Regions:
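A translation/RNA-centric and nucleic-acid-associated enzymatic feature enriched
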Residues: 1-57, 72-191
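Flexible, glycine/charged-enriched surface loops at secondary-structure junctions
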Residues: 61-71
Length: 191
C-alpha cells in the first residue's frame, strides 16, 4: 500500500498498447486497482467478490427501470437466436443469481481437469488445446462459467509461466498467487 496507508485504491483510465481490435478487449477502459497491506490471495478474492456483488446490488436497487428496459430488449433479441444460443436466464435473473450465490473457487489445475473431462474436449469441439501450462482461452472460460458451474468462477494458482513476473510464487515453485474472476456472458472481469 502507499506510504503506510493500509487500504488504498486508484481509479483511472487504462490504455492497451497492443492491438485491441477484438470484441473481447477494449483499447481504453477505466480500472480500479486496490492495494491492501498484509493481505493474501483469499483477501483479494473476497474483496473482488464483495465489490462486484455491491455494484450489481446497487444497480438492481437504483436503476430498476433501465435494467428492465435492457432485460426486455435482450429477451426480444435472443428470441431471434437458435435455442442453443439463448441464455437460460434473463439479464435480471442472472444479476440476481450473482448476488445471491457464492462464487465458485477453483485452482487452475482443477479448471484444466474439468475441461479435460468435458464433452466439448472429448468430442474435439474446443478450437484451442486444453493442457496444463497453457493459458485458458475464452471458450474454456465460457464453458466453466456457463455450462459447468453456471455462476461466476474464481480461478487461482496459475502456472508461473503464463502470469506476470512479479506475481508471488507459491510454495510448489510452479504456480503463482494470481486470480481471475470469470462472469457468465462476459469472461474475465477481475484479474
Amino acid at each position: 500500500a502507499a506510504l503506510a496507508l493500509s487500504k488504498v485504491y486508484t481509479f483511472g483510465p487504462t490504455f492497451r498498447a497492443e492491438n485491441s481490435n477484438t470484441t473481447r478487449h477494449l483499447a481504453e477502459f477505466w480500472m480500479i486497482e486496490p492495494e491492501i497491506s498484509f493481505a493474501d490471495i483469499k483477501d483479494d478474492i473476497d474483496l473482488g467478490e464483495d465489490f462486484l456483488k455491491y455494484l450489481i446490488n446497487y444497480a438492481l436497487t437504483t436503476c430498476k427501470e433501465d435494467l428492465q428496459f435492457l432485460n426486455d430488449r435482450a429477451i426480444k433479441e435472443e428470441s431471434q437466436l437458435p435455442k442453443e444460443k439463448r441464455n437460460e436466464l434473463s439479464l435480471l435473473e442472472r444479476m440476481e443469481m450473482v448476488v445471491s450465490h457464492d462464487f465458485e473457487r477453483i485452482t487452475y489445475t482443477q479448471a484444466i481437469e474439468i475441461l479435460l473431462q468435458s464433452k466439448p474436449h472429448k468430442k474435439k469441439k474446443f478450437k484451442y488445446d486444453v493442457s496444463w501450462g497453457v493459458d485458458l482461452q475464452s471458450e474454456h472460460e465460457k464453458y466453466l462459467v456457463e455450462k459447468h458451474f453456471k455462476k461466476p468462477v474464481v480461478i487461482v494458482d496459475y502456472p508461473a509461466s503464463i502470469k506476470a513476473f512479479y506475481m508471488r510464487q507459491n510454495d510448489d515453485g510452479k504456480t503463482v498467487a494470481a486470480m481471475d474472476i470469470l462472469f457468465p456472458g462476459i469472461g474475465e472481469i477481475v484479474g
